[in-house]
């Protein structure tokens, strides 16, 4: 279909907003400078040449309603006044047309910033938004005029502000996914996007750099912390209070629930299942390097805090079934050998590791809760079964710790609280880009600033096969 017939069909169907009002018939052959008339309004008649009378408002109205069209370049202040009245902005005709002499070209380049800032300083937010919507309709119709003047959608000075581009291309995320379609395909988040910082537009690109060297550094960090924790556990075992002198402290849960001998083993079984689920999610996730880095940094930080709480205060054993006595390791090498045994056995009774005195706070609760939160955060929200299973394993694991009388209730509560708060604080900072360049964030959270400086925004839940296809599979499926 020819371009003219297509444009005519669009005009007849009404798909364009008031086209006969926005492009008008040519009123005069040439442009001449405008001068104020005796009433203070602009004398648009000067454009007709010397001695030509200025058109009245009724004449301009008639011309605008006519079948012919006038290029917006030839719009005068009276045309803009008629357009403003037609759009319902009567109260702004005087300030825009008479006082500030807004013609067609200047109307086309009007921005929301112009309306908010001096000399206009319009105070009514609704009027600002409605006026800008009307102006953007004009800009959309007259994009050829804007491009001729050097304004285009790629230009940083374009009146078609980056805000519109951000609304059209931004991906609003929930749990790492678009909110409008959590079950649909994940859009490409590597494209440039816009954001507001301190009231101004800032152009930034979504970055999700894997930075494997930082991931390796975070793994080294967490392994060093685990080794240090094992050594502290050896020291606190030497300082465990005598059971005859310091009996178990009163505890509401432990006093009310009888001990289940096999419960602590079930806690570690729950932890192993959660660990396998997390390893599977980690392998299949597209941004596995970022996920592993975050897990190691968070786990290392929580266990480093646990080292201090264990060391500064030694609580009495929580039950008479625990045959814990202060065990003295003679030399430093013996302590290191015992610490290596705890470290290599992951501190689990399933691997034959038995410790005493490491009560404030529960390391098993930390691991269970951290794995649960990572599984639920980095899997799609629609995977309800997996999320329910993860929470069931977490809560049952905590219950089994208390049912086995291996920890006081306060140990479990503090561990759960610290782990969840640290996880949520970390991800809130990571998902809020304004904190990435914050001096306060760099001072208070130096490790966070180091690990997350090149992760710009929420990590989307995208999955891919981590291994290369075998040669025979490539030949079969391409």
UniProtKB/Swiss-Prot annotation:
Keywords of the record: Endoplasmic reticulum, Lipid metabolism, Membrane, Sphingolipid metabolism, Transferase, Transmembrane, Transmembrane helix
EC number: 2.7.8.-
Protein name: Sphingomyelin synthase-related protein 1
Location in the cell: Endoplasmic reticulum membrane
Keyword Nucleotidyltransferase among UniProt keywords: no
Free-text comment about domains: The SAM domain is required to retain SMAD8 in the endoplasmic reticulum. membrane protein.
SMART domains membership: SAM
């Amino acid at each position: 279909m020819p371009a003219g017939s297509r444009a005519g069909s669009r005009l007849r169907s009404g798909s364009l907003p008031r086209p006969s009002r926005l492009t008008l018939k040519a009123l005069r052959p040439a442009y001449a400078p405008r001068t104020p008339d005796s009433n203070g309004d602009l004398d648009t008649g000067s454009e007709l040449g010397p001695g030509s009378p200025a058109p009245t408002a009724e004449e301009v109205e008639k011309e605008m309603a006519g079948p012919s069209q006038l290029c917006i370049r030839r719009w005068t202040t009276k045309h803009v006044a008629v357009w403003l009245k037609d759009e319902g902005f009567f109260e702004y005709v005087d300030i825009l047309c008479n006082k500030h002499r807004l013609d067609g070209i200047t109307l086309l380049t009007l921005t929301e910033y112009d309306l908010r800032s001096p000399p206009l300083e319009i105070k009514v937010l609704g009027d600002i938004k409605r006026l800008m919507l009307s102006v953007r309709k004009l800009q959309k119709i007259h994009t050829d005029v804007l491009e001729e003047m050097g304004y285009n959608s790629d230009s940083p000075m374009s009146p078609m502000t980056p805000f519109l581009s951000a609304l059209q291309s931004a991906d609003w995320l929930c749990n790492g996914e678009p909110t409008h379609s959590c079950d649909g395909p994940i859009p490409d988040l590597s494209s440039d996007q816009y954001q507001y910082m301190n009231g101004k537009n800032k152009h930034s690109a979504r970055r999700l750099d894997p930075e494997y060297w930082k991931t390796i550094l975070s793994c080294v960090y967490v392994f060093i912390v685990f080794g240090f924790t094992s050594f502290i556990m050896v020291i606190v075992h030497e300082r465990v209070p005598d059971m005859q002198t310091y009996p178990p402290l009163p505890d509401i849960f432990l006093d009310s629930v009888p001990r289940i001998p096999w419960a602590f083993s079930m806690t570690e079984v729950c932890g192993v299942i959660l660990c396998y689920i997390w390893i599977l999610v980690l392998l299949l996730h597209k941004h596995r390097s970022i996920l592993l880095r975050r897990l190691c940094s968070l786990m290392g930080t929580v266990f480093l805090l646990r080292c201090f709480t264990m060391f500064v205060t030694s609580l009495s054993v929580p039950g008479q079934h625990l045959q814990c006595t202060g065990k003295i390791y003679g030399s430093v090498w013996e302590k290191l050998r015992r610490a290596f045994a705890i470290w290599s056995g992951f501190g689990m009774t399933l691997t034959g590791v038995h410790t005493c005195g490491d009560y404030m706070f529960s390391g098993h609760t930390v691991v269970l809760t951290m794995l649960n939160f990572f599984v639920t955060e980095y899997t799609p929200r629609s995977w309800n079964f997996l999320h329910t299973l993860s929470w069931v394993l977490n809560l049952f694991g905590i219950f089994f710790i208390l049912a086995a009388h291996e920890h006081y209730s306060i140990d479990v509560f503090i561990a759960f609280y610290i782990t969840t708060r640290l996880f949520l604080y970390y991800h809130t900072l990571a998902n809020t880009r304004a904190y990435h360049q914050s001096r306060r964030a760099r001072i208070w959270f130096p490790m966070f600033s180091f690990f997350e400086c090149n992760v710009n925004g929420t990590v989307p839940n995208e999955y891919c096969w981590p291994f290369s296809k075998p040669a025979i599979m490539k030949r079969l499926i391409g």
